[in-house]
């Protein structure tokens, strides 16, 4: 399945972060060096938001190609969280 992904990074200019996007029935995304990957959400999409180690905040979203977006995003500062749409 084709996945459209949009990644927004709000951080210091010299902050470099790696991101991983994978698809297994649903879409999942992991951001930040100290974050853990979210599992699939049964055909939906999952969002992981993590606060970077140097003070940067990273927000990632993976959306299925049908563009039926259900915006349900939470923000966790100082920890990580997973949300299923």
Curated annotation (Swiss-Prot):
Signal peptide extent: none
Gene Ontology BP term (one): sorocarp development
Matches recorded under InterPro entries: HssA/B-like_chaperone, HssA/B-related
Pfam families, per the entry: Coiled
Coiled coil ranges: none
Family: Belongs to the hssA/B family.
Protein name according to UniProt: HssA/B-like protein 62
